[in-house]
Structures are given as C-alpha cells and as structure tokens.
C-alpha cells in the first residue's frame, strides 16, 4: 500500500511537458476555390502519397502564393516532382511545393544556368535565408 501511495504522489507531482502549440495563420496558395486532385496518404502504385495535390481549373501556369511570410529555402528540378520550391515560414512551418510548371524569372535563369553548367536536368540550389523572401 505504501508503494501505491508513493507512486500516486509521484504521478500527481509530475507536470506534463509538451511542445507549445503554434498558432499560425495561413492564406490559400491560389486565388480560386481549392479542389483536391490527390489526397495525403492515398494509395499509389508503390507508395502512399505524401502530400496534397490541387486542381488548377485545367490551366497550367496559375500563380502559386506562399501561405505566410517566409523565404525559399531550397529550389529543385527533379524527374519525379518537376519544379520544386521548399518554403520556410516565419511561424516555424514549412511547405514543399512540387509539380510547379516553372519558376519566377530570376529563379528560372539561375536554375537554367546551373543545368547547363552541370549538363543535367536535375539540379538543387540552397539559397541563403532571405535571398528569396
């Protein structure tokens, strides 16, 4: 009984420690109603889908907005995901934007230059924080 009381007192005295809940406000990445074309966790041929895919009303090249203030932390072109931008937000969250039809002109020029230098379609650039806000 003594052990039970000691254990109960110990359990009651331990404070729960967890991460603080982040409060964040995001905007839509598009200026039109969001419609999903691919869901997170959806079964694919050899894996589960790891993101959300949005329909763009059948139009290629629609502008994609950042969800909040932040900066581009990685720029990639890959065979599987095409044009990719990783964004770090000031609130601590990140997004990976895949399957983009292209990049803004200054980023596109930098990517194309690197592709010619490497003689390779697949490239990766890690800009300095704040270089592309």
Would you name each region that the model predicts?
Residues 18-133:
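Surface-exposed, glycine-biased beta-strand/turn segments
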Residues 4-13:
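Sec-dependent N-terminal signal peptides
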């Amino acid at each position: 009984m003594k052990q039970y009381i000691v254990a109960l007192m110990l359990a009651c005295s331990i404070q729960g420690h967890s991460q603080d809940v982040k409060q964040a406000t995001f905007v839509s990445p598009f200026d039109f109603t969001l419609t999903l074309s691919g869901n997170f966790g959806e079964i694919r041929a050899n894996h589960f889908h790891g993101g959300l895919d949005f329909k763009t009303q059948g139009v290629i090249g629609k502008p994609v907005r950042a969800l909040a203030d932040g900066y581009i932390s990685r720029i990639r072109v890959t065979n599987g995901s095409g044009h990719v931008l990783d964004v770090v937000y000031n609130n601590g969250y990140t997004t990976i934007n895949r399957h983009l039809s292209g990049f803004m002109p200054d980023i596109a020029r930098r990517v194309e230059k690197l592709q010619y230098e490497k003689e390779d379609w697949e490239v990766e650039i890690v800009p300095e924080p704040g270089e592309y806000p």
